From Swiss-Prot:
Binding site for Fe cation: 213, 215, 263
GO process terms (BP): base J metabolic process; DNA repair
Catalyzed reactions per annotation: thymine + 2-oxoglutarate + O2 = 5-hydroxymethyluracil + succinate + CO2
Gene3D superfamilies attached to this UniProt entry: 3.60.130.30, JBP1, DNA-binding domain (1.20.120.1440)
GO-annotated cellular components: nucleus
Native source organism of the sequence: Trypanosoma brucei brucei (strain 927/4 GUTat10.1)
Protein name: Thymine dioxygenase JBP1
Co-factor requirement: Fe(2+)
Organism taxonomic ancestry: Eukaryota, Discoba, Euglenozoa, Kinetoplastea, Metakinetoplastina
């Protein structure tokens, strides 16, 4: 019976998987949204307009940010700090053994469900998300708080396969940020820590691109950890929105970051709109409410009950109230940093120490002296009047379906098919069916509450008929005893709903389905049990009062006299206790809803790494070279002269002949902005060097020695701290030349090389509307080639895209640390920070 009821109540939730419209409704500062199947009906223009307005209001609170909105993409092991030196994020590629993430993914995929609870972070569409471990369940209809999630309870044996990943992640956290690991480890209650780690909870997301948000409820003095377990995709970087930086992540990568900073995911980088992709990620954190007094008291209550029942399998004899710190659930303060290619490179863990100090010094100099930045890279960090930013109407919306405004305020949808479904299933709330699911005490409470309300409705209806014998519609008095009896019946029904579902929480579609069935049951009772006319009560009126109950009931309670408020609270407690005493009918997740055993840590088992021949978590963490103090601390001071080599493409004997440029909106966008016009009118930047000499020219700038040389020239066997390859690859042809160019010049850098190039891809390439993208692709190469030719006096130009350039970098034996985007650059310039791969 329980399976049958749960199946019925979930039928409408399954509609979210069907093709249809994305539905948005902002309410109480949170955007509630779900997918609605339209059954082929037409949406009028007014509804579309209202829906669009509702969506725009929604994304004001949780906006999406694209890759183009950020300046830096980190790829290698990175430690990113704010202006005060506090670590904001630590990216560690290939941090987790693949066997551990694979084992965990096989289990945690089962924890993922389509839920509307986080739809505000997904642009209004219900994403696939779930939780595992332990949770406090504050603000949910689940009456038993501070315990295992339903997933963990139901998958005890399988849960053990997650432990290696937990151990590896915890060890990495401890090695990188030991002070915060210790604070978090000391605070998390032992009864809710996952396998000895400082984590209490996992959030698992599948194919989930989040809008900008902070993780409310995480421990303030700790860090969250994000790991990608499996997937085939590009893009979806984790972005720190207030800092303009992104962390590129692929399976087995780990990111430790301050979850109280606003963060989001950038767009999926897919060549085709309907490309197949998948991504399963996991966030590890300590849910701070689990260490607060209400939860500690719940642990103690369960432990006391277990001792009274003389349980022999207790994992704890007492519960300690630990110092949980102050958890404000407020966003972290933002201390912005100015971004340059040098500060970008200084965040690379491989360049820590002396190299980072030099890079920080160079960063300070170019921020103070804009002309030095131009001397080094050929253009400033940002150009205000360069390539214009894309207008919103040029970009594909995050969710492409038409947005239809629906009003969900706690009741149910009154569409015909939904009402018919509710009427067909109303008998599931008949007494004989409920007795198969719940204990006698709870069913009696339901029966008494139902009977009491019907009696008051009958009395009120008879009075109304006496006053007006022709009356056909029931008039609902909000201040009557009948209204309060209805609220009482709703309290009972809400507990009934909890018992009918096996999920940890009831999503909006499931809740709508239940309340629709509840209303149909009551409407039928009004007709067949107390003799009201068909439609006298009606589904619409009951729906209005259900919305009143769900969103106005608390207000009405506050308006009641104190003694009535207390009576209502006692009544609700009585209902909850009756449910707790209900017998267990089967071994499904309904057991979890009523489970109040002291079963903390009963699933925990040791992992024998030696027997399995797996690398230990401690040895795995040592691979990344974190010192005992972790990644804290500032770099040392840069002393002595810093040497920089700038390599320029050699100009040809004449500038490229002016060719006929295309005329289109996209061509004008590239060629007619003021910065582009200046390039066309200015002298080529590489004309100053003597083309007859193959030797370098030296420029001194304080304690910075800058040598300049043409590609193909000689530096006399010198090595340099840093090499800047300025638009060299665009002057090469084929596959072999760019690789040879990269190998030659990167080999002269002690620390790293900046590969500066034109990027043929529009910064919004993957989300441009098709007609805009096609127009851009038709003109971009010829337009940027003309600008490049004017800047470097070249008659042969081979511009490339970022994916092509990344391929060259990899094949040349170099490692990519990061990518820096020059904002507004008329050449759409990017700088790749690369270093020679360690042998």
């Amino acid at each position: 019976m329980r399976r049958q009821v749960k199946k019925v109540l979930r039928e409408k939730a399954d509609d979210s998987m069907k093709p249809g419209w994305d539905v948005y409704q902002p309410s109480n500062d949170v955007v509630y949204a779900f997918n609605h199947y339209m059954q082929g009906s037409q949406i009028d223009a007014e509804a579309r307009e209202k829906a669009e307005k509702a969506f725009q209001e929604a994304v004001k609170k949780h906006p999406f940010h694209n890759n183009a909105d950020h300046t830096v993409d980190f790829h290698g092991t990175t430690v990113f700090r704010n202006a005060k030196g506090k670590v904001c994020g630590v990216l560690i590629p290939k941090a987790l053994p693949s066997f551990a993430t694979s084992m965990a993914a096989d289990v945690l995929e089962c924890a993922v469900a389509r839920t509307s609870l986080r739809s505000a972070l997904f642009g209004g569409v219900s994403p696939n998300s779930g939780i595992a471990g332990y949770f406090d369940y504050r603000g949910t209809p689940v009456e038993l708080k501070c315990r295992k999630t339903s997933f963990t309870y139901e998958h005890t044996k399988e849960w053990r396969s997650v432990f290696p990943m937990i151990d590896y992640t915890s060890a990495i956290y401890k090695a990188a940020l030991p002070d915060h690991w210790k604070a978090q480890d000391a605070a998390v209650p032992d009864v809710v820590r996952i396998h000895g780690s400082p984590f209490s909870t996992l959030t698992v997301n599948e194919r989930f691109r989040t809008a900008s948000h902070t993780d409310n409820g995480d421990f303030d003095n700790g860090y969250g950890v994000l790991a990608v377990l499996k997937g085939e995709y590009s893009g979806l970087s984790l972005a720190l929105d207030d800092y303009g930086v992104c962390f590129n992540m692929q399976p087995t990568d780990v990111l430790l970051f301050d979850t109280h900073l606003f963060h989001s995911n950038t767009e999926l980088e897919a060549k085709e709109a309907n490309a197949t992709w998948n991504r399963l990620s996991c966030v590890f954190y300590y849910r701070a409410a689990l260490g607060e007094q209400p939860c500690v008291e719940e642990y103690r209550r369960r432990l006391k009950k277990a001792k009274e029942e003389k349980s022999t399998s207790l994992s704890f004899n007492h519960i300690e109230q630990k110092d949980n710190g102050e958890n404000t659930n407020k966003p972290a303060p933002v201390y912005p940093v100015s971004l340059t290619p040098f500060s970008c490179a200084a965040s690379a863990w491989a360049l820590r120490g002396c190299a980072a100090a030099m890079l920080t010094r160079l960063h300070g100099l170019v921020r103070e002296n804009a002309s030095l930045m131009t001397e080094l890279f050929g253009e400033p960090v940002e150009v205000a009047d360069g390539l214009p930013r894309r207008a919103p109407e040029e970009i594909i919306p995050v969710h492409k379906h038409t947005n239809v405004q629906m009003h969900y305020l706690g009741g149910f949808s009154e569409k015909g098919d939904i009402l018919n479904e509710a009427m067909n299933k109303r008998h599931y709330l008949d007494k004989e069916n409920l007795q198969k699911m719940f204990g006698e005490e709870f069913v009696n409470i339901w029966t008494q509450s139902r009977t009491h309300w019907l009696q008051l409705v009958k009395k009120e209806w008879e009075h109304q008929k006496e006053t007006n014998p022709t009356r056909t519609r029931f008039s609902w008095n909000n201040t009557s005893a009948m209204n309060f009896a209805f609220f009482d019946l709703c309290d009972v029904a809400k507990q009934l709903m909890c018992g009918a579902f096996g999920d940890r929480e009831v999503n909006k579609k499931e809740e709508q389905s239940f309340w629709g069935m509840f209303a149909a049951h009551l409407d039928n009772a009004c007709i067949n049990e107390i003799g009201m006319l068909q439609g006298s009560m009606g589904m619409h009126k009951l729906n209005v009062k259900l919305k009143d109950y769900n969103f106005g009931g608390t207000r009405y309670l506050k308006d009641m006299p104190p003694e009535e408020q207390e009576r209502r609270r006692r009544r609700r407690l009585e209902i909850e206790q009756a449910r707790r005493r209900a017998p267990i009918c089967d071994s499904e997740s309904g057991d979890w809803l009523r489970n109040e055993a002291f079963d903390y840590q009963t699933e925990d088992v040791a992992v024998n790494y030696e027997r399995e021949q797996w690398i230990t978590p401690e040895n795995n963490a040592k691979r990344f070279g974190f010192p005992e103090r972790g990644v804290y601390g500032a770099e040392g001071a840069a002393t002595g002269t810093i040497s920089v080599l700038i390599v320029l493409p050699k100009p040809t004997n004449h500038r490229q002949k002016t060719c006929e440029l295309p005329t289109s909106r996209e061509a004008d966008r590239i060629m007619k902005n003021p910065a582009a016009q200046r390039l066309l009118c200015a002298k080529p930047c590489n004309i100053g060097l003597s083309t007859s000499s193959n030797k370098s020219r030296t420029v001194l700038c304080g304690n910075i020695r800058i040598d300049k040389v043409f590609d193909g020239g000689s530096v006399g066997g010198k090595m340099y701290d840093f090499v800047i390859m300025r638009h060299l690859l665009a002057a090469t042809t084929g596959e072999r030349e760019p690789l040879e160019c990269l190998v030659r010049w990167t080999s002269l850098a002690r620390y790293c090389t900046f590969v500066v190039e034109v990027d043929l891809l529009d910064r919004h390439h993957y989300i441009l509307k098709s007609e805009i993208g096609e127009e851009y692709s038709a003109v971009s190469e010829i337009c940027f080639s003309a600008l490049y030719s004017a800047t470097y006096a070249r008659d042969k130009v081979n511009l490339r895209t970022t994916p092509c350039l990344l391929s060259f970098i990899d094949k040349s034996g170099n490692m990519l640390e990061s990518r820096f985007k020059f904002n507004g650059s008329p050449l759409n310039t990017v700088a790749f920070v690369v270093r020679r791969r360690e042998k």
